[in-house]
């Protein structure tokens, strides 16, 4: 008889323990999380800034902008010549 009564009590106690802290107890953790948000945002912004600067520098050092500019100017010249011959 005692075993039958102790098993439901054990289940209830385990469910209470595994449930975690009550909302009133967790309030301190939430406030500390909100206090850390500006620091995390600043860290994220600095990381993003560093990565953006590195990407811009690598683009500046590569020859992709010059090749793109040359390709567009050649394509524009071809279209211009084609239109001249078509409407002349």
Swiss-Prot record:
Single GO cellular component term: very-low-density lipoprotein particle
Write the record's keywords in alphabetical order, separated by commas. Answer: Lipid transport, Secreted, Signal, Transport, VLDL
Alphabetical list of Gene3D superfamilies matching this protein: Apolipoprotein C-I (4.10.260.30)
Signal peptide, first to last residue: 1-26
State the InterPro entries in the record.
Answer: ApoC-1_sf, ApoC-I
Q: Taxonomically, which superkingdom?
A: Eukaryota
Main location, first listed in the record = secreted
Which tissues is this chain's protein expressed in? Answer: Expressed in the liver.
GO MF annotations in UniProt: fatty acid binding; phospholipase inhibitor activity
Which one GO biological process term can you cite for this protein? triglyceride metabolic process
Q: Where in the cell is it found?
A: Secreted
Family the entry assigns = Belongs to the apolipoprotein C1 family.
Role of this protein = Inhibitor of lipoprotein binding to the low density lipoprotein (LDL) receptor, LDL receptor-related protein, and very low density lipoprotein (VLDL) receptor. Associates with high density lipoproteins (HDL) and the triacylglycerol-rich lipoproteins in the plasma and makes up about 10% of the protein of the VLDL and 2% of that of HDL. Appears to interfere directly with fatty acid uptake and is also the major plasma inhibitor of cholesteryl ester transfer protein (CETP). Binds free fatty acids and reduces their intracellular esterification.
Designated name of the protein: Apolipoprotein C-I
* Organism of provenance: Canis lupus familiaris (Dog)
What gene name does this entry carry? APOC1
